Amino acid sequence: MPPPAPLFLSLASTPPPALMPVHHPRAPQSLTLVPPVASSRKAAAVPACPVASPRHSDYFDPRAPPPPRGDGGYGRPPNGAQDGRVFTSYSIYKGKAALSFDPRPPLFVPLDSGAYKVAKEGFVLLQFAPAVATRQYDWTRKQVFSLSVWEIGTLLTLGPTDSCEFFHDPFKGRSEEGKVRKVLKIEPTPDGNGRFFNLSVQNRLINVDESIYIPITKGEFAVIVSTFNYIIPHLMGWSTFVSSIKPEESRPYSRPQSTSEYEWRR
């Protein structure tokens, strides 16, 4: 007699607790949720607002408040300073001294017509501070020197082996003239890989005779040159003039034209 045919028994099984039921788009009303199977292991508490690791700077939480709109970001003044003054500088720190370059804006005076004119050009203030320890500088003993626009131009024209010297008397034309002497020398280093900035100050009013020098590398001097080229129009007030030009307010040039101007406009 042949053996009996095997019997197959099919039993309905409960879906695993970690799986969600399949969603059928055509019949959303028939969607049911299978309650998870009770487990003896206690689930860890989930925080209401997850916090990303500090390493993930690109984490975005839709519940978090939106970031600021850029008032305090790169290229713009901080909050509340849109109409205020912004100070900036370029500083170089070496073993024996530190040197800071600080631009100063031109002085504008109002006219009766409501316009403005430049009464005094801006300048770049050089501040030398001697070192008192490793990476420590005494800014209370600093010596300063103001570079005018034409002095900046002289510095920009220096060749690899050229040097220049500027002399200042802060009291020139006054009764104390000659009592304070400041001499700034800029000369190449012996190896030709940089510059020396040397400031000598003699002040007989307070019995000071001091000389502070600092070596400047080629890279640092390149930054100085690039910055000076950029800042010159701003120190002269020309950038402010260009920003004030408005096509809708332009009027015909009414000053009598010279022969050369007439030839130029032909």
Curated annotation (Swiss-Prot):
Per the record's keyword annotation, is Iron included, yes or no? no
- What's a single GO CC term here? nucleus
Localisation per UniProt entry: Plastid, Chloroplast stroma; Nucleus
Transit peptide location: 1-37
The cross-references to InterPro entries, in alphabetical order and at most eight, read: ssDNA-bd_transcriptional_reg, Whirly
Q: Where is this region: Disordered?
A: 53-81
Is Membrane there in the keyword field? no
Main location (coarse class):
plastid
Motif Nuclear localization signal located where? 172-185
- Any idea which GO molecular function terms this record carries? DNA binding; RNA binding; single-stranded DNA binding
Gene Ontology annotations of biological process type = defense response; DNA repair; negative regulation of DNA recombination; regulation of DNA-templated transcription
Entry keywords, A to Z:
Chloroplast, DNA damage, DNA repair, DNA-binding, Nucleus, Plastid, RNA-binding, Transit peptide
Question: Per the record, what phenotype accompanies loss of this gene's function?
Answer: Albino seedlings lacking plastid ribosomes.
- Region Required for ssDNA binding, as annotated, extends over 94-99
Q: What does this protein do?
A: Single-stranded DNA and RNA binding protein that maintains plastid genome stability by preventing break-induced and short homology-dependent illegitimate recombinations. Functions in RNA metabolism and is involved in the maturation of the atpF and 23S ribosomal RNAs.
Q: Which PANTHER family match?
A: SINGLE-STRANDED DNA-BINDING PROTEIN WHY1, CHLOROPLASTIC (PTHR31745:SF2), SINGLE-STRANDED DNA-BINDING PROTEIN WHY2, MITOCHONDRIAL (PTHR31745)
Q: Quaternary structure? A: Homotetramer.
Assigned protein family: Belongs to the Whirly family.
The protein's name in its UniProt record = Single-stranded DNA-binding protein WHY1, chloroplastic
